[in-house]
Amino acid sequence: MVIKFLSALILLLVTTAAQAERIRDLTSVQGVRQNSLIGYGLVVGLDGTGDQTTQTPFTTQTLNNMLSQLGITVPTGTNMQLKNVAAVMVTASLPPFGRQGQTIDVVVSSMGNAKSLRGGTLLMTPLKGVDSQVYALAQGNILVGGAGASAGGSSVQVNQLNGGRITNGAVIERELPSQFGVGNTLNLQLNDEDFSMAQQIADTINRVRGYGSATALDARAIQVRVPSGNSSQVRFLADIQNMQVNVTPQDAKVVINSRTGSVVMNREVTLDSCAVAQGNLSVTVNRQANVSQPDTPFGGGQTVVTPQTQIDLRQSGGSLQSVRSSASLNNVVRALNALGATPMDLMSILQSMQSAGCLRAKLEII
């Protein structure tokens, strides 16, 4: 009897520990976020895969402006047909608390009709924020993840060649002003809105830090009273973020990607008993050109092309199949696989099942 009790207790503790997560994994601090940066620049050193300057006048204009700043004057009316230069857009994210001299990654994307950025070098490009202030300078060799080759009118390409990345390719030159440490309250934002989780996090903080330390404002935000000063708030948040809370069950959800046909569901999805009839209707149109020539060579007839079209209509399936009630994800998968439907068919089946009240989950189409 004692052994059974200890076994049940150990199982309960393991289950509880497996469901506990740190507050830092469930929330973020309001105001502590990344900021987007953007810039326009030139990539040089391409192996004949750059912009066709006759079709992208902005590339030539940018090159002339850059040469003018370097003290080189290009005669007016000069038609520079270069193939190793490309105009690009450069994007980056300025991390929270980014300091001067810190390096960040940048993404380089072709703006014109360049065939590839492989082997290119990004020239010094200022990166600006929404306030038009320069916060970083980007420059460096571009790493392109794709590969390609062409010869004799044929080409082979693997992955994308018109975009690349420069690791640590930008240096922060200006710091963003921060309001961290000002005031006596901070808001923790849940990654996913959940009233019960917000209240549970507030209760956990109040249990450790005292009643009134945290208040759940809504399903997304928890207001926390913090001491004043940067160092005090850093220590306070470090303690709070490492607190563990028991994660409540997720909302049952099915996510459908209408472009790729992929269907993803979490473990909370359940099915009620229902009957499904699913049929496939396919239409095949085949058009073939027939050449009709006159039988006699000198009869005055003409050779004409007559199109011949064949249409084939087929319908398969349509039998009524029973779907049993399923309370676990494995049983849901087995029940849906028993229908023998493709992912594209499964999207419409799940929509119909939700309309009939048989799918106990939220259906999200992206």
From Swiss-Prot:
Keywords attached to this entry: Bacterial flagellum, Periplasm, Signal
Signal sequence coordinates: 1-20
Signal keyword on record: yes
Gene Ontology molecular functions: structural molecule activity
A Pfam family hit: FlgI
Compartments it resides in: Periplasm; Bacterial flagellum basal body
GO CC terms, sorted: bacterial-type flagellum basal body, distal rod, P ring; outer membrane-bounded periplasmic space
Source domain of life: Bacteria
Biological process annotations from GO: bacterial-type flagellum-dependent cell motility
Stored InterPro entries: Flag_FlgI (IPR001782)
Transmembrane segments: none
Keyword Nuclease carried by entry: no
Family statement: Belongs to the FlgI family.
Function text: Assembles around the rod to form the L-ring and probably protects the motor/basal body from shearing forces during rotation.
PANTHER family: FLAGELLAR P-RING PERIPLASMIC PROTEIN FLGI (PTHR30381), FLAGELLAR P-RING PROTEIN (PTHR30381:SF0)
Quaternary structure note: The basal body constitutes a major portion of the flagellar organelle and consists of four rings (L,P,S, and M) mounted on a central rod.
Protein name (Swiss-Prot/TrEMBL): Flagellar P-ring protein
Organism, as annotated: Escherichia coli (strain SE11)
Lineage: Bacteria, Pseudomonadati, Pseudomonadota, Gammaproteobacteria, Enterobacterales
